[in-house]
């Protein structure tokens, strides 16, 4: 996972009024917290945040903070992002300070590879789990987890426990939880036509 720069400014005032003022000036409020530091209120440009988390990996990019006094040079990931439900614009962000030597838990997207054999037989793909929680060092966070579905037949599923192990990455969650299934019945062969 690549590292990106994010400019932040310390802010001493908090509350709805200040948050609205920030949003009008194309900035958003945020907070930085983590092991070894007290929570610090910050503001940052909306466009910079959007660019920093754009593309594969999204919120799991390691961000290096610039500005913000004692926060300068700290590495963070986006722990939570509150967005406007209609416009999709960021409203508030929680940034979690990380240490590259400590494992963290993050959710990564599931990327389906291939076409399931059961779909070719007329089945319907049920993609139940679009993200999977993993634990690893920040430098080992994958952009996504590939799940090969080519051999998935009708009435069968791929579960968390079926995923192959990746070096340095521990997949979390119930091993019996279904990630993807193929629903439906096999096509019935046409019944022979009786001669009159």
UniProtKB/Swiss-Prot annotation:
CC annotations in GO: cytosolic large ribosomal subunit
GO process terms (BP): translation
Disulfide bonds: none
Domain of life assignment: Bacteria
Keyword annotations: Ribonucleoprotein, Ribosomal protein, RNA-binding, rRNA-binding
Residue stretches spanning the membrane: none
Record-linked CDD domains: Ribosomal_L25_TL5_CTC
Gene Ontology molecular functions: 5S rRNA binding; structural constituent of ribosome
Membership in a protein family: Belongs to the bacterial ribosomal protein bL25 family. CTC subfamily.
Subunit structure, as described in the record: Part of the 50S ribosomal subunit; part of the 5S rRNA/L5/L18/L25 subcomplex. Contacts the 5S rRNA. Binds to the 5S rRNA independently of L5 and L18.
Chain's role: This is one of the proteins that binds to the 5S RNA in the ribosome where it forms part of the central protuberance.
HAMAP family (UniProt xref): Ribosomal_bL25_CTC
Protein name from the UniProt record: Large ribosomal subunit protein bL25
Gene responsible for this protein: rplY
